Curated annotation (Swiss-Prot):
UniProt cross-references to Pfam families, sorted A to Z: GAD (PF02938), tRNA-synt_2 (PF00152), tRNA_anti-codon (PF01336)
The gene coding this protein: aspS
GO molecular function terms listed in the Swiss-Prot or TrEMBL record: aspartate-tRNA ligase activity; aspartate-tRNA(Asn) ligase activity; ATP binding; nucleic acid binding
The protein's name in its UniProt record: Aspartate--tRNA(Asp/Asn) ligase
Function of the protein: Aspartyl-tRNA synthetase with relaxed tRNA specificity since it is able to aspartylate not only its cognate tRNA(Asp) but also tRNA(Asn). Reaction proceeds in two steps: L-aspartate is first activated by ATP to form Asp-AMP and then transferred to the acceptor end of tRNA(Asp/Asn).
Region (Aspartate): 198-201
Keywords of the record: Aminoacyl-tRNA synthetase, ATP-binding, Cytoplasm, Ligase, Nucleotide-binding, Protein biosynthesis
Keyword flag Protein biosynthesis: yes
Organism for this UniProt entry: Burkholderia pseudomallei (strain 668)
Length: 600
């Protein structure tokens, strides 16, 4: 008989009366009046093994096993006695009567029980191998595998070719920091780990491969958040001779296919499309969570002439904004709730949180409860009530500051209230999946510190055809042929139509204050390639980690990556990064300089 004939979790009634050989880990061992029960676990689940003292040698071995011992069991599949069936297990109607038990490897006492749901992330990542044995982690990584498989199936059917691009490449710092790799044979020179395969996939389009994809690692040396890692995985795609709409349609179908085949979710037949400007105006975010039924009301123009300086000053400032957020039935929020929200928005730079409770709208000013009503004229109050559509029992929150502060703070408040218990109880948030495309992004953003425009996405994104003239006259007006796929408030994919003409790419570099010499030094290989009849092309990259995180309902992408880094970009399992031997540094022609200590 083979060492293993079946997986534990797949032993069901179809094997009744058969002898099986199972291998796995002791999940639990229970001694019930001389009979030992072992819950044996492998990647497919659990099966109950019964060890009877009639077989002395086997029973002696069973007495010695403990949690996480790796064992082999041979025995007879039989039905469980009446009253002992476990409907929660696939194997819950049967058990295996053990004939032979072999300890393949003993285990020291584990630092935690695998079913302990209150472990710190530090403990889990330090003992990641054990953590990965937990059923939820097994589920997450198998889900990740299925998502990757379905992406490959779809792309293969659509004529895409899987082509690997280099991991050691040229540093072109335009955005996040590169991870640098010193070259031993080229002293003083460095490779960079790719932030994306962007330029190589464009070169593949010039090289006539027409449709490319790869599921690949990317690297960015940036501060980490719950949805970021220094190394992450993209489903990276590029195609020639398709316009923006055709590209969006192609990859919208791919995401629908992946969700249907992996978690049996039917996404919308057509994803709504929203311009960036509309998303910012209505939700304060370029990745709006459409499950939350709250929207901003624009008040900037209506607050220009009020005496209340908190509103009028930003309303008359070039980059200022005044916006309101009406919360239906929010009148029941307590002062403690409001104070909590006030402290919350301070995280995003807001100086405070103005509010008005609408008790009886028909009474005008007298029907309102608020510390700011006394500072507003009747006409201003009427404008607020009219524009927000406030009803009796509502509360209106206000943000007035620089547009970025207003968008960030009121946008975060919108999500916090919507997803709160109050929001759920009052129908302010829907369940399910709400995808959309956000399009028509600004081509450039102005960097005050550098006193120049920087690329909002990357400098290889094509401007909209009607905005080409702005590249040289007014770059700030230029919109890009860029598009992001957003799902439940997460950007799961982003892409664009690329620049395929060398003269347009050179104009973009000039708008970014990248001179001809610098452009040639950093991107000469791309500019040269574009001169050889480069086709119109575009593409998209999806964050595999993010997609799987959402599907799994996980709190962090670290829960869907086998061996992730912490928020300090460290691996607690291997203790990477770590010091290296002085000899290695000498071979690389590198001398370390100790970081300067902050002055007391």
């Amino acid at each position: 008989m083979s060492m293993r004939t079946e997986y534990c979790g797949l032993v069901t009634e179809h094997l009744l009366g058969q002898t099986v050989s199972l291998c796995g880990w002791v999940h639990r061992r229970r001694d019930h009046g001389g009979v030992i029960f072992i819950d044996l676990r492998d990647r497919e689940g659990l099966v109950q093994v019964v060890c009877d003292p009639d077989r002395a040698e086997m029973f002696a071995a069973a007495e010695g096993v403990r949690n996480e011992f790796c064992i082999q069991v041979k025995g007879l599949v039989r039905g469980r006695p009446e009253g002992t069936i476990n409907a929660g297990l696939k194997s819950g109607r049967i058990e295996v009567l053990c004939h032979e038990l072999n300890v393949l490897n003993a285990s020291v006492t584990p630092p935690f029980q695998l079913d302990d749901d209150n472990l710190s992330e530090t403990t889990r990542l330090t003992h990641r191998v054990l953590d990965l044995r937990r059923p939820q982690m097994q589920h997450n990584l198998r889900l990740r595998y299925r998502v990757a498989i379905e992406a490959r199936k779809y792309l293969d059917e659509q004529g895409f070719i899987d082509i690997e691009t280099p991991m050691l490449t040229k540093s072109t710092p335009e955005g996040a920091r590169d991870y640098l790799v010193p070259s031993r044979v080229n002293a003083g020179q460095f490779f960079a780990l790719p932030q994306s395969p962007q330029l190589f996939k464009q070169l593949l389009m010039v090289a006539n491969f027409d449709r490319y994809y790869q599921i690949t690692k990317c690297f960015r040396d940036e501060d980490l958040r719950a949805d970021r890692q220094p190394e992450f995985t993209q489903i990276d795609c590029e195609t020639s001779f398709l316009g923006e709409q055709e590209i969006r349609d192609l990859f919208e179908d791919m995401i629908r296919h992946i969700f249907k085949t992996t978690i049996d979710v039917e996404l919308d037949a057509t994803f709504p499309v929203m311009p960036y400007s509309e998303a910012m105006a209505r939700f304060g975010s370029d990745k709006p969570d459409l499950r939350v039924k709250l929207e901003f009301t624009e008040l900037t123009d209506a607050m220009k002439d009020v005496d209340f300086k908190v509103f009028s000053t930003p309303a008359n400032t070039k980059d200022g904004r005044v916006a309101a957020l009406r919360v239906p039935k929010g009148g029941e929020l307590t002062r403690g709730d409001i104070d909590g929200y006030t402290e919350f928005v301070r995280i995003y730079g807001a100086k405070g949180l103005a509010w008005i409770k609408v008790n009886e709208r028909a009474k005008g000013r007298d029907g309102l409860q608020s510390p700011i009503v006394k500072n507003l004229h009747d006409a201003s109050i009427a404008a607020i009530l009219e524009r927000t559509g406030a009803q009796d029992g509502d509360i209106i929150f206000f943000a007035a500051d620089r547009a970025k502060v207003v968008n960030d703070s009121l946008g975060a408040l919108r999500l916090k209230i919507g997803h709160s218990e109050f929001g759920k109880a009052n129908g302010l948030v829907e369940a399910g999946w709400k995808p959309l495309w956000v399009v028509d992004f600004p081509m450039f953003e102005y960097d005050d510190e550098e006193a120049r425009y920087v690329a909002a996405h990357h400098p290889f994104t094509s401007p909209k055809d009607e905005h080409l003239e702005y590249l040289e006259t007014d770059p700030g007006r230029c919109l890009a042929k860029a598009y992001d796929m957003v799902l439940n408030g997460w950007e799961i994919g982003g892409g664009s139509v690329r620049i395929h003409r060398e003269e347009v790419q050179s104009k973009v570099f000039r708008a970014l204050k990248i001179g001809p010499e610098e452009a040639q030094a950093k991107f000469g290989f791309l500019l040269d390639a574009l001169q050889y009849g480069a086709p119109p092309h575009g593409g998209i990259a999806f964050g595999l980690d993010r997609i799987v995180t959402m599907m799994a309902g996980a709190d962090s992408i670290r829960d869907v990556i086998a061996f992730p880094k912490t928020q300090r970009a460290q691996c607690l399992l291997t203790q990477a990064p770590s010091p290296v031997d002085e000899r290695q540094l000498r071979e690389l022609h590198i001398r370390l300089r100790q970081p300067e200590q902050p002055k007391a």
